[in-house]
């Protein structure tokens, strides 16, 4: 039987995926610890992604964004 797994990837930093696994056949106490730990780790990953996004936005200039061109029908 497979483990319960969650993978979370940051769009701005795909080199550091986050993976959390819980073995099948766990005790109820382990489930609570698992979800508390999972929540903390996902929050940490979201914070990391937000920091990466902020850095990316600060370094991008007007010339880095392609110009919008009208669609001609």
Curated annotation (Swiss-Prot):
Which cellular compartments is it found in? Nucleus; Chromosome, Telomere
Q: What processes does the entry annotate via GO biological process terms?
A: tRNA threonylcarbamoyladenosine modification
Quaternary structure, per UniProt, is: Component of the EKC/KEOPS complex composed of at least SPAP27G11.07c/BUD32, cgi121, gon7, pgp2 and SPAC4H3.13/PCC1; the whole complex dimerizes.
- By what name is this protein known? EKC/KEOPS complex subunit gon7
Record-stated family:
Belongs to the GON7 family.
Taxonomy, superkingdom: Eukaryota
Q: Does the keyword Nucleotide-binding apply?
A: no
Protein purpose: Component of the EKC/KEOPS complex that is required for the formation of a threonylcarbamoyl group on adenosine at position 37 (t(6)A37) in tRNAs that read codons beginning with adenine. The complex is probably involved in the transfer of the threonylcarbamoyl moiety of threonylcarbamoyl-AMP (TC-AMP) to the N6 group of A37. Gon7 likely plays a supporting role to the catalytic subunit pgp2 in the complex. The EKC/KEOPS complex also promotes both telomere uncapping and telomere elongation. The complex is required for efficient recruitment of transcriptional coactivators.
Keyword terms, alphabetized: Activator, Chromosome, Nucleus, Telomere, Transcription, Transcription regulation, tRNA processing
Protein's organism: Schizosaccharomyces pombe (strain 972 / ATCC 24843)
List the record's Gene Ontology CC terms alphabetically: chromosome, telomeric region; EKC/KEOPS complex; nucleus
């Amino acid at each position: 039987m497979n483990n319960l797994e969650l993978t979370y990837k940051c769009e701005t930093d795909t080199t550091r995926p986050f993976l959390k696994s819980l073995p099948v056949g766990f005790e109820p106490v382990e489930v609570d610890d698992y979800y508390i730990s999972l929540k903390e780790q996902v929050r940490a990953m979201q914070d990391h992604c937000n920091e990466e996004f902020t850095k990316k936005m600060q370094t991008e200039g007007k010339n880095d964004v392609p110009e919008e061109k009208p669609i001609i029908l």
